[in-house]
């Protein structure tokens, strides 16, 4: 405001906002002049220089994974929570239904992070957009649910900010995922690129103007407000995973975009090297506080046997074992619990429901009906076999009821399965 003091007589009857706008324009003009004429940024950095970096992992011992990423004044705390697949977010759009998100990134940046008071309410467009960009940045390197049967929630809490918070969210979530033991394919880093063009406003930019285009690595707030572009790039050592760009000009030639992408690669690699010095690869074991999950692939045709009529069977398994059971349409079954004994009990139960009958194997069965020629035995849920009277004992029998009665529990061996799937059983020579 002291800069504008000589001119205050011109604004005595003007709203205070005019002063604020004039001051902002003066600052923006000075930021642009420093970069274009002197090649110096507001904090003294070179055009391709990244702010000082500092990071930690495992700073919150009770959560499943955590990290703190600091770049200059911008600081992001990330927390990872692992849960069974049933916790996936159901997604319905105008075009599709039934989609699920197994990786969810939530981004929060309260007013206090920029030194202002304010209410904390539902997320706005900025929070949703930044969270979605950081989410998209990590999706290409995440394991499949078959490889890692967990729903993953990543929450970034911005602690302080001066530009590039979405890229800080990307870096902090990458480190927290590795701290949690999520087997990501490669670490991911992100950097925001800026642009100052030394041309009159509204003048068309051509390829010949590339020498007048000043590309900035690791954009800060003052440069974002004064500049012509905010271009966010995330990726691994092998390639780019996400891009997002805002422009204040009417278009950019390919040559300037190429320059920005090449310069962003150097910035990303510098940040990536820093991340991998803090945590090089995903931890081999999950947190002791994370739920234990076992997976089993079954024939999709057997899903009905596990679920049962009206969900009766799966509800019974959950109630009697205390484990949580989820089934995907692909046949992937996941069993989750904090107790390994409960998981094993549920797993064995499900295996017995979906097991295919095997010739030569001995089963515990129940006599379900008696006929003159033999008996029908239930050996597995939904699977019966026929025990001929000649296969009950080595001695000759006149009636099946001399040995067997409905409801008897007996041991039988499968001796044959014909091409129609009919099973022949025997009680002879079981030892």
Which residue stretches match the model-derived regions?
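Conserved phosphate/anionic-ligand binding catalytic regions in large, soluble enzymes, centered on
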Residues: 57-80, 162-183, 304-314
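Short, hydrophobic beta-strand segments
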Residues: 8, 154-156, 160, 243-248, ...
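Single-stranded RNA-binding regions, centering on S1/OB-family and related RNA-binding modules
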Residues: 289-293, 300-431
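Glycine-rich, flexible beta-strand/loop modules in the N-terminal catalytic cores of phosphate-handling
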Residues: 59, 64-150, 239-249, 253, ...
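Flexible hinge/switch segments at interdomain interfaces of large molecular machines
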Residues: 104-114, 145-149, 234-240, 250, ...
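Mobile "lid/hinge" segments at catalytic clefts and subdomain interfaces of large enzymes
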Residues: 177-284
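Short, small-residue-biased leader/transition segments that mark boundaries at the very start
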Residues: 3-10
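Structured alpha-helical segments in the cores of large, soluble enzyme domains
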Residues: 101-107, 111, 130-145, 177, ...
């Amino acid at each position: 405001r002291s800069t504008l003091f000589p001119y205050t007589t011109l604004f005595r009857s003007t709203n205070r906002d005019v002063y604020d706008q004039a001051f902002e324009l003066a600052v923006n003009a000075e930021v642009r002049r420093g970069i274009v004429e002197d090649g110096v940024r507001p904090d003294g950095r070179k055009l391709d220089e990244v702010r000082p970096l500092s990071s930690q992992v495992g700073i919150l011992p009770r959560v499943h994974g955590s990290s703190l990423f600091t770049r200059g004044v911008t600081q992001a705390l990330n927390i990872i929570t692992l849960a069974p697949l049933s916790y996936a977010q159901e997604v319905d759009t105008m075009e599709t239904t039934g989609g699920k998100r197994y990786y969810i990134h939530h981004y929060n940046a309260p007013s206090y992070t920029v030194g202002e008071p304010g209410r904390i309410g539902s997320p706005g467009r900025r929070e949703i957009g930044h969270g979605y960009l950081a989410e998209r940045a990590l999706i290409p390197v995440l394991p499949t649910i078959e490889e890692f049967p967990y729903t993953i929630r990543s929450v970034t809490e911005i602690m302080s900010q001066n530009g590039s918070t979405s890229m800080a969210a990307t870096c902090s979530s990458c480190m927290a995922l590795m701290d949690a033991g999520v087997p990501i394919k490669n670490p991911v880093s992100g950097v925001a690129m800026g642009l100052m063009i030394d041309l009159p406003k509204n003048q068309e930019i051509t390829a010949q103007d590339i020498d007048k285009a000043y590309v900035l690595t690791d954009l800060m707030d003052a440069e974002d407000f004064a500049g012509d572009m905010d271009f966010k790039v995330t990726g691994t050592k092998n390639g780019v995973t996400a891009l997002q760009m805002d422009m204040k000009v009417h278009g950019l030639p390919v040559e300037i975009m190429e320059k920005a992408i090449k310069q962003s690669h150097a910035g990303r690699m510098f940040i990536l090297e820093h991340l991998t010095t803090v945590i090089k690869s995903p931890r081999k074991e999950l947190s002791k506080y994370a739920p234990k999950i076992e997976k089993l692939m079954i024939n999709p045709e057997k899903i009905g046997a596990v679920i049962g009529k009206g969900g009766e069977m799966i509800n019974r398994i959950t109630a009697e074992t205390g484990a949580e059971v989820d089934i995907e349409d692909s046949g992937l079954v996941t069993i989750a619990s904090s107790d390994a004994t409960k998981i094993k009990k549920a797993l064995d139960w499900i295996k017995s429901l979906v097991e295919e009958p095997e010739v030569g194997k001995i089963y515990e069965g129940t006599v379900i009906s008696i006929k003159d020629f033999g008996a029908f035995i239930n050996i597995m849920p939904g699977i019966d076999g026929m025990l001929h009277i000649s296969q009950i004992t080595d001695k000759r029998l006149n009636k099946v009821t001399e040995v067997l009665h409905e409801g008897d529990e007996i041991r039988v061996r499968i001796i044959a399965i014909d091409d129609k799937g009919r099973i022949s059983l025997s009680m002879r020579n079981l030892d």
